[in-house]
């Protein structure tokens, strides 16, 4: 029986007609294989119609995966108590036998496929399977990557309708030409709260060769929303093979003088200020998480892979996050997950207002002081609780930039690290290679706040991409360095660090100071201000920052603060070079240029140290 004949026999006539309209034998083969394997009771094919999207929304409520909240458009979804985050241990990249890739959890492909197919046999029995079509990047553009998602979770399908552009018509347009990504998900057997029961059989297997991701016995978005971090592994591999960049970066517009618009991307590890930077209220957001960057006629053009936000809700409060707060308290289409609900209203940790003493949360019925089976007190919401919302709900979204098929020109790229004592608040690279290597490839995040006499642990996280790499880091960096050669106009590269501390542990910067660094970077992209050359890159002049602090924040900025923040800390910089160099030497197969650029930086620092000492005032470089 041909795949088409099987589908005709297995699907309702109305659903079969939807598939027939696409005319793609590879798609038919894929659907036939996995509908037979998962063995659902019924199959629903989603087109781009509003009716089909509404059907998914309705099913999420009817199947008990979501419940309506008091405000129109708001729903709550709960994942299982032990299904609240990405499962790093059971997320594996399937590779040919004997292949190992540094930093990556790999598994023999044949063995992995055999295991996941056994786990998924009949896993959707008695359930409804949804087949959804989406695209990554703007439609009908150089960025477009079509993708098909099979899932028996209406919550997962609903999330994807909020986060991604619909792709059924794009599949029809491309027909047999479509080079598409594939995602197969089942939540598995559900308990009485409609959460995945067999967590011991939770698996997330990424088959690079087949460009397919399998996800079983889990509901948490990071493990199940195929087009997010699962697709990201596949697009990183594609980008490296095809010579473009698939990055873990926000994309935002910084508004310069006289209505000038300049677009920046930014890669920051978790807890380093990525979302708060992208959401500054007087600038404009294009995307908060994933960006494709391609060469178009010698320009680096960027596009948001997504059209929505799957954001961490903990700590979102009215004072620090006015825009997100407003969005979450308006009648938008929002899925809240793993927060506390009382009388139809959502509450979360550190929201800055009183939280009820009881209600329902990810642990079931909750009361203050409730403990789990290990004796840990359960907080009102999970620390990884989320909100899922479309970007068009945000008043400061640059909607034109979000959907333009040719993307936006990237003027600057920002790498945001976190340390108490090394990187100054903002600096600019000398050139592309210097930025890629000493800023992007050397990105670290201090995991604990440094206290007196005790240093935080610095997690190495180049380009904030380590968790998602699907190729050798050397290959990934080589592609980055090669990409520059295609460009006539090169984005400037910057590094930021919002977390410097004084010796007594006090922060050296206020939360909103970052908005000044952004304005300075925007001016530098256009050559509107000069900068001071130091051994580690260009830093701002005091006079320029003094003026910008007044203009942007209406704050006085003292010479003393400037000096404390922008002092070049030579011993700390040298120690960092040592750390980064060792990591890459141990890994092997790294472009030689990386070691050359690090050595040049070391040489400049030692020279400056001999002249000015260990801690060099920025005024010394004038």
From Swiss-Prot:
Q: Name one GO cellular component term.
A: cytosol
One annotated GO molecular function is: phosphoenolpyruvate carboxykinase (GTP) activity
Q: Which reaction does it catalyse?
A: oxaloacetate + GTP = phosphoenolpyruvate + GDP + CO2
Which residues of the sequence carry a binding annotation for Mn(2+)? 229, 248, 289
Question: What Pfam families does its record include?
Answer: PEPCK_GTP, PEPCK_N
What Gene3D superfamilies does UniProt report for this protein, alphabetically?
3.90.228.20, Phosphoenolpyruvate Carboxykinase, domain 1 (3.40.449.10), Phosphoenolpyruvate Carboxykinase, domain 2 (2.170.8.10)
Pathway named in the protein's UniProt entry: Carbohydrate biosynthesis; gluconeogenesis
Which domain of life does this protein belong to? Archaea
Per the entry, the cofactor note is:
Binds 1 Mn(2+) ion per subunit.
Q: What sections of the sequence does the record tag as coiled-coil?
A: none
**GO BP annotations, alphabetical order:** cellular response to glucose stimulus; gluconeogenesis; glycerol biosynthetic process from pyruvate; oxaloacetate metabolic process; propionate catabolic process; response to lipid; response to starvation
Q: What class of enzyme is it?
A: lyase
Q: State its cofactor.
A: Mn(2+)
> Which keywords belong to this entry?
Cytoplasm, Decarboxylase, Gluconeogenesis, GTP-binding, Lyase, Manganese, Metal-binding, Nucleotide-binding
The primary site where this protein sits is cytoplasm
Q: Which residues of the sequence carry a binding annotation for GTP? A: 271-276, 386, 418
- Per UniProt, the ranges with Basic and acidic residues bias are 360-374
UniProt-annotated catalytic positions: 272
- Which of this chain's residues are annotated to bind substrate? 86, 220-222, 270, 384-386
InterPro entries xref list: PEP_carboxykin_GTP_CS, PEP_carboxykinase_C, PEP_carboxykinase_GTP, PEP_carboxykinase_GTP_C, PEP_carboxykinase_GTP_N, PEP_carboxykinase_N
Reported EC number(s) for this entry are: 4.1.1.32
Region Disordered, residue ranges: 360-381
Where does it live in the cell? Cytoplasm
Family as reported in the entry's similarity comment: Belongs to the phosphoenolpyruvate carboxykinase [GTP] family.
Q: What is the documented function of this protein? A: Catalyzes the conversion of oxaloacetate (OAA) to phosphoenolpyruvate (PEP), the rate-limiting step in the metabolic pathway that produces glucose from lactate and other precursors derived from the citric acid cycle.
What name appears for this protein in its UniProt entry?
A: Phosphoenolpyruvate carboxykinase [GTP]
Query: Per UniProt, what is the name of the gene that codes for the protein in this document?
Result: pckG
